[in-house]
Regions:
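Conserved S-adenosyl-L-methionine
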Residues: 162-172
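Short, glycine-/aromatic-enriched active-site segment of Class I SAM-dependent methyltransferases
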Residues: 122-144, 155-156
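Conserved SAM-binding loop
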Residues: 2-130, 229-232
């Protein structure tokens, strides 16, 4: 389940791509598929997530010619030289960071001139509903510390040395799922409504029925849970 359209971005053969806050590697595998001649690095602070990502990468490594690697480090101080990467992906990370503008400076530093920066984060009003329904949702350790507005995010990111290209929204069908989880936060693991809706999402992800994909795309401009943005380093 990807939160970007990688068909919009072309990078040189043999390019280097960083997935900042890669988690268990969801976007690493999409990157490996789209850019088989690139070298991919996943960076995260969570050792167990990196272990799972490495196991997945070992399975998918046959689809890339250049390889993939993982490192545990902070997005505030990355162990890479200036101008190292052709693209940096940062999906659903910035909303967790207290000093996210420091991370933007670090991303700008490790990107090559004219390199691409692809951030995503929760869309404003679907996220606002989650905060309204459950205080625990955004107060849990490591949770979301802010809600971005689209124009605010574009202006702030642009002020750190990036040119805005475009944006789009994804995962509309996930918004009601998170609303249900927030509504029944204390019992979400056993709640039948949450379980029933989760089964619909699992069907969409694993089986990809056409009617659910079409419904998701129709609703994305209004209901999309995540907003993805495309920037280029000045």
């Amino acid at each position: 389940m990807l939160t970007f359209d990688f068909n919009k971005i072309e990078i040189p053969k043999g390019g280097k791509i960083l997935d900042l806050g890669c988690g268990e590697g969801r976007h690493i595998f999409g990157i490996m598929d789209k850019y088989p001649d690139s070298y991919c690095i996943g960076l995260d602070l969570h050792a167990e997530s990196l272990k799972i990502a490495q196991e997945g990468a070992d399975y998918f490594e046959s689809i890339t010619n250049e390889g993939v690697g993982f490192t545990m480090a902070s997005g505030y101080q990355m162990p890479f030289a200036d101008s190292s990467f052709d693209m940096v992906v940062c999906s659903e990370v910035l909303e967790h960071l207290i000093n996210y503008e420091d991370a933007l400076d670090e991303i700008q530093r490790v990107l090559k001139p004219n390199g691409y920066f692809l951030p995503s984060f929760p869309s404003f009003w679907p996220e606002r509903v989650c905060w309204f329904l459950s205080e625990d949702y955004h107060n849990m350790p490591g949770g979301h510390v802010r809600i971005f507005r689209k124009k605010q995010a574009i202006n702030v990111i642009s002020s750190h040395g990036f040119n805005f290209i475009s944006h789009e929204r994804f995962h509309a069908l996930h918004a009601p799922y998170w609303w249900l989880r927030c509504m029944f936060w204390k019992t979400q693991e056993t709640n039948k409504l949450v379980a029933a809706y989760k089964s619909i999402l699992e069907k969409q992800i694993l089986q990809k029925p056409l009617y659910l994909d079409i419904l998701d795309k129709i609703l994305n401009p209004i209901l999309g849970k995540s907003i993805a943005m495309y920037f280029q380093k000045k």
